[in-house]
C-alpha cells in the first residue's frame, strides 16, 4: 500500500476523480493474518472491492494491481465478472510463484491496460507482449512500456503516471 508504484496509480486515479482504495494483503504491513497461499489474498481483493462498493455506490469498478497484486487481482476479476477496467502494473509474467504462472489467464478480466517497465526483472517485454497477444483474441488489451524502468519503476514514476494517464484516456500520452 505504501509502495511508490501503488501511490502513483492512486494519485493518477484520484486526480481524475475516480474513487480509490488502497489496501495491504493479509500479513503485509499492519494488516492482520498471514499469507495463505493465494485463496486468502483473493478473498482480500473481494473484501476490498465490497468495501469500496459500499462507500461509492454502483459506479464503474476499476481494479488495479501491482506485481503480486496484479496476479491476485486478475484472478478475482475473472471470477467476479463486475470489473469494468483492469490495470496491471509490473505484471510478473516471467515468474513462477508457488508453482503458479499467468497461464490461468485465458481472457482479459475486463478491458485491460498493462503498464510495464521495459527492463522489468519479473515480466520481460517479450513475455508481456506474448500474454497481450494471446489475450487480445478474447478482448481489448493495451500495453504501454516505460522505457528503461525496472520492476519498481525506479526513477521513472513520472513516466509511469504519464503512461497510466495516456492508457486510461486521462491526458498525457
Where do the protein language model's features map onto the residues?
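Serine-hydrolase catalytic machinery in alpha/beta-hydrolase-like enzymes
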Residues: 1-58
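A conserved short beta-strand
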Residues: 82-94
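Short beta-strand/loop motif that positions the catalytic acidic residue
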Residues: 107-109, 113-116, 120
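Catalytic histidine neighborhood in serine/cysteine hydrolases
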Residues: 133-152
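Catalytic histidine-centered segment of alpha/beta-hydrolase-like enzymes
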Residues: 33, 149-161
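Gly/Ala-rich beta-loop-alpha elbow adjacent to hydrolase catalytic centers
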Residues: 65-73
Amino acid at each position: 500500500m505504501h509502495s511508490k508504484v501503488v501511490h502513483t496509480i492512486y494519485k493518477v486515479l484520484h486526480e481524475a476523480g475516480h474513487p480509490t482504495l488502497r489496501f495491504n494483503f493479509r500479513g503485509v504491513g499492519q494488516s492482520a493474518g498471514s499469507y495463505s497461499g493465494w485463496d486468502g489474498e483473493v478473498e482480500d481483493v473481494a473484501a476490498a472491492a465490497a468495501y469500496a462498493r459500499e462507500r461509492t455506490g454502483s459506479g464503474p469498478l476499476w481494479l488495479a494491481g501491482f506485481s503480486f497484486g496484479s496476479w491476485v487481482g486478475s484472478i478475482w476479476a475473472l471470477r467476479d465478472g463486475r470489473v469494468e477496467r483492469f490495470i496491471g502494473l509490473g505484471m510478473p509474467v516471467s515468474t513462477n510463484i508457488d508453482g503458479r504462472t499467468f497461464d490461468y489467464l485465458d481472457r482479459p478480466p475486463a478491458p485491460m491496460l498493462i503498464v510495464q517497465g521495459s527492463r522489468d526483472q519479473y515480466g520481460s517485454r517479450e513475455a508481456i507482449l506474448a500474454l497481450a497477444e494471446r489475450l487480445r483474441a478474447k478482448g481489448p488489451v493495451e500495453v504501454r512500456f516505460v522505457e528503461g524502468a525496472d520492476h519498481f519503476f525506479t526513477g521513472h514514476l513520472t513516466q509511469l503516471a504519464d503512461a497510466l494517464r495516456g492508457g486510461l484516456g486521462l491526458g498525457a500520452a
